[in-house]
């Protein structure tokens, strides 16, 4: 009987699924794929383009595969850095790369003309006859990040731009986007309004089997045994208790006497609430299903077959739904802690032509599956509210649509009162992280339009930023570990649970007890919680004891003992509140909770070196430089999943000893050398692996200690300074932009330095001359003669010492000049002036 019911049920389900999804994969006629609005390429600063949808194929529900055709003026393929479709409302993600040097995606061979296939969500038209795509964008980047720059200087268009495709920004019946999105018949059916009715009919046949159950239940009340169990109609009011026995092994109850058929029929009254769903369509009970039951002579078989639909999917779904709420009741609608909502990557506002902004996600609440409600916080430099034309969030991957308008003069939406600072709530799809512990938003954009379409123009002329711009939010365009988007998207723990890897084990644990301990669930608090919704259950909570005292104790003795010899004692354990002992007795589950902890391993590599590109930004410009740094990789294996964590860290200083080198630094301005400096610094050679090849890189670093001369260990023994002598030098003397050549007499002395090692160094030094007069008187009987001599003296020596000990009659000062200087105070002053000029 079990196998026959299984075959019967599977045939019913297969037929229902075939009828429900038989038209899946249908392709719409090309002639019926048309623009959803009229759009003209209003942006004249972008290359001319022709972007359209040329085909659509229905997948399931509101999901379609569409063919996108792209034609535009372009450079060569070697100049292309990246080309991608962003802001998609798609089950496969919000971005599709068609060409990327950074990500190594090369799906096209001609950037001027190409096609690609996209899987997208759609929204229904007002008459429910057509479906329409959500808005999206196509982003193009040229001549950057390793792409060839040949021909880029002659390219008259921007190096980076986005084509906007959509019908969500209408003005005077025309979309302000570059191109429109497209629409086509719903499910690619040309009969508008017919398919929905036919789509409901296959659902009713799937439920038409259930009206057979009420008909069979109506027949069974005709049996005298069913009315004897008058309390069971109250039990049908609580569908869960009987259903769980049905999902338990009551198929073995039919193996007992025919009385189990009565509970099986009494269980059909349990499904009599499910016929309430078909009772919405009472036509089917009036259909030819009732005659079919009289044609079937064996009513017990029909209840058994009617049980099978009850246990086919719907009772199992309640049981599974009762199982799922047990773990989901705890996280149902939980809000993630604010501290655990963090950026999914590092992004710097690289675009300096837009107003400075701070856009982030400040909160997340789990709704269901991969759907979350998030709070977006926006702060940016702005004009007044009266100048705002439109402000909206576009490119969302959301069940409510790809665009949310927060302010629009055209659409009459005024949800904010301060364009410089506001918050809003978004319902979005998310994608799981590699370790399945976190979820992350898909990329999106925030579009701002000022001073147009009826907005005030006061102050617009003084606005230094563009009148229309888009903030890009995402982590899908990484370069050197930094996102090239304006701001990052955010991530948070999956289902807002802080126990990564534990929740799946707890979700598995309830499944294990539910399969083995379903009898406990009737006795446990789950069903009493469900009965609490109906006041009859407290009465029926005692009625299960009455059946235990009635003839049905034989059924537990016959059905439960073979199935639940282990659990037959456990119902007594819950009565004795020994549920804590169940985990103690079933050590397998704690074992399963401990097992994920045992295989967790961590392996950390030594510090190696790598090159990073660091971007330093000032007020309006940014510069990039290569920096050598350390990198470590930690491999973590948990539950069989391996995660590699890369950490950049400073290089250990104790392993590097800089070598002093002389460096010439030249500062340029206006293509001319303005200053050249020679200084000593440290140099370190590093072997760096870049792109798989090893390269020796010299990195300049400050010296940890002062540069020590080679004679640092050699002590000076003696210093001998020679007597000053005179010499003549030639200098250019300039005054008031007029230069002339002058001959200057100056002093020169030599210092002979002898070191303890025996080395000798002679250092010549030019010194100015200082005039000193010394009168030597010679006493004689016949004549007194006075002699005046000009003595060259090193600056800094006292005049008295020069007068007494530095008289050198043998030294002559440049013939023809000394005599004049000796006798003329004016000439001496001139000599001092030249000496000063020389200094």
Curated annotation (Swiss-Prot):
Compositional bias of kind Low complexity: 593-606
Positions of region (Disordered): 187-342, 496-606
Gene from which the chain derives: FLO11
Sequence ranges of Acidic residues compositional bias: 198-317, 506-592
Protein name: Flocculation protein FLO11
Similarity comment text for this entry: Belongs to the flocculin family. Highly divergent.
Entry's free-text remark on domains: The Flo11 domain contains aromatic residues that form two hydrophobic bands on the surface of the protein that confer homophilic binding. The hydrophobic bands are lined by stretches of acidic residues that may sensitise the protein to environmental pH.
Protein role: Homophilic binding protein that enables kin discrimination in heterogeneous yeast populations by mediating homotypic cell-cell interactions during flocculation, a reversible and asexual process in which cells adhere to form aggregates (flocs).
A single BP term in Gene Ontology: cell-cell self recognition
């Amino acid at each position: 009987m079990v196998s026959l019911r299984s075959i019967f049920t599977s045939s019913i389900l297969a037929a229902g699924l075939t009828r429900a999804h038989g038209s899946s994969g249908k392709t719409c006629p090309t002639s019926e794929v048309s623009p959803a609005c009229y759009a003209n390429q209003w942006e004249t600063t972008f290359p001319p383009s022709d972007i359209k949808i040329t085909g659509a194929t229905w997948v399931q529900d509101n999901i379609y595969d569409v063919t996108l055709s792209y034609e535009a003026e372009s450079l060569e393929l070697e100049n292309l850095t990246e080309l991608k479709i962003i802001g998609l409302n798609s089950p496969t993600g919000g971005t599709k790369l068609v060409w990327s040097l950074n990500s190594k995606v090369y799906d096209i061979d001609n950037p001027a003309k190409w096609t690609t296939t996209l899987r997208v969500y759609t929204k229904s038209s007002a008459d429910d006859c057509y479906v329409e795509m959500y808005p999206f964008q196509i982003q193009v980047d040229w001549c950057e990040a390793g792409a060839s720059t040949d021909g880029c200087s002659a390219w008259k268009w921007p190096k980076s731009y986005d084509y906007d495709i959509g019908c969500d920004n209408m003005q005077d019946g025309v979309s302000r986007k570059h191109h429109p999105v497209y629409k086509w018949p719903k499910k690619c059916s040309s009969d508008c309004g017919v398919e929905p009715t036919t789509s409901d009919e296959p659902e009713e046949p799937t439920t038409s089997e259930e009206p057979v159950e009420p008909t069979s239940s109506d027949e069974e009340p005709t049996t005298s045994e069913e009315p004897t169990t008058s309390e069971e109609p109250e039990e049908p009011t609580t569908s869960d208790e009987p259903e769980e026995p049905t999902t338990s092994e009551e198929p073995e109850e039919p193996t007992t006497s025919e009385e189990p058929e009565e509970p099986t029929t009494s269980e059909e009254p349990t499904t009599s609430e499910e016929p309430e769903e078909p009772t919405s369509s009472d036509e089917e009970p009036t259909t030819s299903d009732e005659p079919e039951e009289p044609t079937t002579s064996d009513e017990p078989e029909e209840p058994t077959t009617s049980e099978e639909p009850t246990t086919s999917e719907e009772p199992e779904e309640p049981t599974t739904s009762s199982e799922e709420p047990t773990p989901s009741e705890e996280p149902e609608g939980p809000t993630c802690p604010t501290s655990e909502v963090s950026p999914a990557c590092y992004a710097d506002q690289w675009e300096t032509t837009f107003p400075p902004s701070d856009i982030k996600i400040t909160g997340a609440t789990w709704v269901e599956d991969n759907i979350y409600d998030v709070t977006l916080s926006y702060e940016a430099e702005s004009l007044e509210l009266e100048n705002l034309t439109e402000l909206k969030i576009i490119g969302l991957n959301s069940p409510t649509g790809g665009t949310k308008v927060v302010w629009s003069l055209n659409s009459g939406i005024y949800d904010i009162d301060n364009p410089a600072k506001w918050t809003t709530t978004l319902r979005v799809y998310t994608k799981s992280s590699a370790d399945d512990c976190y979820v992350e938003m898909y990329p999106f954009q925030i579009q701002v339009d000022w001073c147009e379409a009826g907005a005030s123009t006061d102050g617009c002329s003084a606005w230094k930023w563009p009148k229309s711009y888009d903030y890009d939010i995402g982590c899908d365009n990484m370069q050197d570990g930094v996102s090239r988007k304006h701001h990052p998207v955010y991530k948070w723990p999956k289902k807002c649970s802080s126990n990564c890897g534990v929740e799946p084990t707890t979700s598995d644990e309830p499944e294990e007890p539910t399969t083995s301990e379903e009898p406990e669930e009737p006795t446990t608090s789950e069903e009493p919680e469900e009965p609490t919704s109906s006041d009859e259950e407290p009465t029926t909570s005692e009625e299960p004891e009455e059946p235990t005292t009635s003839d049905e104790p034989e059924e537990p003795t016959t059905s439960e003992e073979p199935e639940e010899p282990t659990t037959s004692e456990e119902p007594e354990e819950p009565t004795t509140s020994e549920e804590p002992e169940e985990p103690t007795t079933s050590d397998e589950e704690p074992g399963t909770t401990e097992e994920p902890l045992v295989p967790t391993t961590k392996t950390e590599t030594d510090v190696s070196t790598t090159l990073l590109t660091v971007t330093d930004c000032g007020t309006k410009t940014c510069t990039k430089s290569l920096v050598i740094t350390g990198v470590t990789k930690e491999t973590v294996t948990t539950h069989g999943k391996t995660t590699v964590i890369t950490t950049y860290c400073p290089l250990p200083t104790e392993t590097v000893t800089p070598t002093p080198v002389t460096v010439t630094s030249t500062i340029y301005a206006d293509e001319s050398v303005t200053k050249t400096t020679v200084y000593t610094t440290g140099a370190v050679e590093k072997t760096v692996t870049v792109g798989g090849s090893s390269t020796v890189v010299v990195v300049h670093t400050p010296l940890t200690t002062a540069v020590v001369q080679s004679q640092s260990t050699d002590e000076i023994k003696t210093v001998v300074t020679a007597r000053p002598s005179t010499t003549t030098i030639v200098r250019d003397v300039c005054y008031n932009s007029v230069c002339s050549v002058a001959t200057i007499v100056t002093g020169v002395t030599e210092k002979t330095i002898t070191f303890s090692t025996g080395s000798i160094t002679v250092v010549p030094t030019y010194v100015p001359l200082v005039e000193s007069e010394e009168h030597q008187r010679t006493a004689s009987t016949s004549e007194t003669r006075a002699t005046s001599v000009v003595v060259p003296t090193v600056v800094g020596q006292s005049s008295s010492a020069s007068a007494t000990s530095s008289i050198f009659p043998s030294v002559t000062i440049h013939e023809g000049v000394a005599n004049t200087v000796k006798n003329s105070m004016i000439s001496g002053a001139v000599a001092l002036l030249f000496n000063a000029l020389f200094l």
